Amino acid sequence: MQRYRQLSQLDKEAGGILIGRILLENENFIIDDTSEPMPTDTRKRYRFIRTPEGHQEYFNNIWQKAEGRCFYLGEWHTHPERIPTPSSIDKKDWMRILKLDFESDILFFLIVGTKEIKVWYGQKKNKRIVELPRRD
């Protein structure tokens, strides 16, 4: 994800999906992998639209290698700002994703800024999205 930071004025937003595990013993989440931008994605300076093509195949490949022991855990994308904040479009998209059917009640949303990565999580049952506090 870091290699897609928008450090120059010409860099376009990038993004992908988060893939990982949910530990049964403590319900902790581990993000093991991420997809990278695909040729079918829309990438502009201030907009990224992920298409299913490519990302789904990438997930399927990881799922087979993990013998079905991995899950879709959310989305990531970049912003051309030092400390990223979600746009109204981001928030709407996250709420739309939360309404879809996934194994987990919680999904994660990462935005990679030029200096920091910020993380939010959303819960299906209460339809809330909350920023995870940064631990230094």
Give each language-model segment a name:
Residues 1-72, 81-136:
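Conserved beta-strand-loop surface patch within small alpha/beta domains used
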Residues 77-79:
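Histidine-centered divalent metal-coordination motifs
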